[in-house]
């Protein structure tokens, strides 16, 4: 598998995302990934709607997207970026959180918002197992959340 096997592929729609990530409703938290630059950077898009199950309890009458789901959306964006950038489309790849650092929440994310997840690879190489990412989530250009996170890539879904 080559790190530049898809050099012209700069975006992933929901169909391609589902070929890369094992997540499905209600835990698939990215609708589209654009501006993919190999395995180095990408921008995910999540259209936040009232139909999401977490809004039933977080919080009744005042729906706010849970911060942990924002961080997960950044991680899923990173997974799609790696899947495209390292030619792991249609494989059994799994990515596991190992660490989350410097996580801060700056504004509420509510139904009707378009959440953009901007992710960059800080450390990690094609063929490697451990990757560190920097992520920022924005709504209308305003910072909603930020975090650094480390993940392990399991290319065949057997390393756990």
Curated annotation (Swiss-Prot):
SUPFAM superfamilies referenced in this protein's UniProt entry, alphabetically: Thioesterase/thiol ester dehydrase-isomerase
Main location: cytoplasm
Catalytic function, reaction form: a (3R)-hydroxyacyl-[ACP] = a (2E)-enoyl-[ACP] + H2O
Gene Ontology MF term list: (3R)-hydroxyacyl-[acyl-carrier-protein] dehydratase activity
EC number: 4.2.1.59
The entry's keywords: Cytoplasm, Lipid A biosynthesis, Lipid biosynthesis, Lipid metabolism, Lyase
Free-text function comment from the UniProt entry: Involved in unsaturated fatty acids biosynthesis. Catalyzes the dehydration of short chain beta-hydroxyacyl-ACPs and long chain saturated and unsaturated beta-hydroxyacyl-ACPs.
Annotated family: Belongs to the thioester dehydratase family. FabZ subfamily.
Matching NCBIfam families: fabZ (TIGR01750), PRK00006.1 (NF000582)
Listed name of the protein: 3-hydroxyacyl-[acyl-carrier-protein] dehydratase FabZ
